[in-house]
Amino acid sequence: MQIYMVGGAVRDRLLGRPVNDHDWVVVGATPDDMVARGYLPVGRDFPVFLHPETREEYALARTERKSGRGYRGFVVQTSPDVTLEEDLSRRDLTINAIAASADWTGAEDLFDPYGGARDLQARVLRHVTDSFREDPVRILRVARFAARFTDFTVAPETMQLMREMVHDGEADHLVPERVWQELARGLMEPQPSRMFDVLRDCGALAVVLPEVERLWGVPQRPEYHPEVDTGVHLMMVLDMAAHLQAPLTVRFACLTHDLGKGTTPHDVLPRHIGHEQRSARLLKAVCERLRVPVECRELADVVAREHGNIHRSGDLGAAALVRLLERCDAIRKPARLDEILLACECDARGRLGFADRPYPQRARINAALAAVQSVTTSSVAAHAAQLGLSGPKVGEMIHAARVQAVADWLHATAQPAPEPRGNAG
């Protein structure tokens, strides 16, 4: 029985990156051998075991044979006769197909039959063998790695293979859970735009996210968007979200906030009046199709509907500001308002020449919320009771008190209006 470190741990160590998790492959063993040594079986589709002390995963060396379309169409074979090279051959990229002895200290301890170390040096993402085409999830993984390793390029032959897979319909069989899983991971990488560049280049974006694909080539008003192209703007917004270290909820909201611009009638371009409502409808379809988690779905919906109003909040009076806060549910969920405003800031700064501009709307709306929170609702309700009021009338009094508090704040501070964003959104 021989044990080797494989995959991302070897790759990241060779790149000088932090190694958080270790993956191990075991050659020459049976499941009974592993159990006899105290390993805990946990694999559902193939033999994977947890180390009795470290709890790290150890997988028996295996081969995979395509038996149908999509992610699940595989027959897995494990036996003590499966070699390390055979196990590595089923992996997606050469940089992930390097093995090392458990106590490796240098290059002499590496087993690299497919040139992964060479591709690490050359900064190339290259498929291991033609069996890459058997799993369409690998298209998404290559795109995600492009977003992580921002100085790597996709090998031309790998890009061509991915295009062939899309043309042959393999991407049509991606299951929603895996699409979302890879999309979420890609959004959290240092340069998310590169994921979408790769997916567009191979044609997969039109399959998995046609609502996003159609944004390229859609013009916006240049006085608000010097970059003009909506797809280009979207990528700038995503990279700004990464730059500001936004959480996944915010990054997904950034991805989907302008979907409605892809359905703007051609005869009104480059204006996009009402795109916020259209974006929300398209967002709902995306979330249902990909089974997006509720926290991402809810934040993205608010951002899609309200980002234009938040951009223009400098033009809003007290009553309109309070209504905006209420629509954002900011009074009950002030922490979520921070994420809404962060997404809007990414939108505003994700424009050509605006990356270093301030976003005073954030401070203005937070100050308006503070004024609203200064209203003691129990005191207002008690006063309403003294007046013999109940039910909806109490709510109206609370709302009026909040509007007055914001009006007093606006008057006391003589708040200047932020730079207008117009209707560009």
Swiss-Prot record:
Comment on bound cofactor: Magnesium is required for nucleotidyltransferase activity.
Q: What is known of its domains?
A: Comprises two domains: an N-terminal domain containing the nucleotidyltransferase activity and a C-terminal HD domain associated with both phosphodiesterase and phosphatase activities.
Q: Does the keyword Transferase apply?
A: yes
The residues that hold CTP are 8, 11, 91, 141, 144
Specify the protein name.
Multifunctional CCA protein
Annotated GO molecular function terms are: ATP binding; CCA tRNA nucleotidyltransferase activity; cyclic-nucleotide phosphodiesterase activity; magnesium ion binding; phosphatase activity; tRNA binding
Q: What species does this protein belong to?
A: Acidovorax ebreus (strain TPSY) (Diaphorobacter sp. (strain TPSY))
Self-association or partners: how does it assemble? Monomer. Can also form homodimers and oligomers.
List UniProt keywords, sorted A-Z: ATP-binding, Hydrolase, Magnesium, Metal-binding, Multifunctional enzyme, Nickel, Nucleotide-binding, Nucleotidyltransferase, RNA repair, RNA-binding, Transferase, tRNA processing
Q: Which residues form the HD domain?
A: 230-331
| Residues engaged in binding ATP | 8, 11, 91, 141, 144
Q: Miscellaneous notes for this chain? A: A single active site specifically recognizes both ATP and CTP and is responsible for their addition.
Reactions listed under catalytic activity? a tRNA precursor + 2 CTP + ATP = a tRNA with a 3' CCA end + 3 diphosphate; a tRNA with a 3' CCA end + 2 CTP + ATP = a tRNA with a 3' CCACCA end + 3 diphosphate
Which family is this sequence assigned to?
Belongs to the tRNA nucleotidyltransferase/poly(A) polymerase family. Bacterial CCA-adding enzyme type 1 subfamily.
Some GO term, biological process aspect, for this entry: which one?
tRNA 3'-terminal CCA addition
Q: What does this protein do?
A: Catalyzes the addition and repair of the essential 3'-terminal CCA sequence in tRNAs without using a nucleic acid template. Adds these three nucleotides in the order of C, C, and A to the tRNA nucleotide-73, using CTP and ATP as substrates and producing inorganic pyrophosphate. tRNA 3'-terminal CCA addition is required both for tRNA processing and repair. Also involved in tRNA surveillance by mediating tandem CCA addition to generate a CCACCA at the 3' terminus of unstable tRNAs. While stable tRNAs receive only 3'-terminal CCA, unstable tRNAs are marked with CCACCA and rapidly degraded.
The record's Pfam families line, in alphabetical order, gives: HD, PolyA_pol, PolyA_pol_RNAbd
- Which amino acid positions bind Mg(2+), per UniProt? 21, 23
Domain of life of the organism encoding this protein: Bacteria
Against InterPro entries, the record matches this protein to: CCA_bact, HD/PDEase_dom, HD_domain, NT_sf, PolA_pol_head_dom, PolyA_RNA-bd, tRNA_CCA-adding_enzyme
Q: Per the UniProt record, which EC number(s) apply here?
A: 2.7.7.72, 3.1.3.-, 3.1.4.-
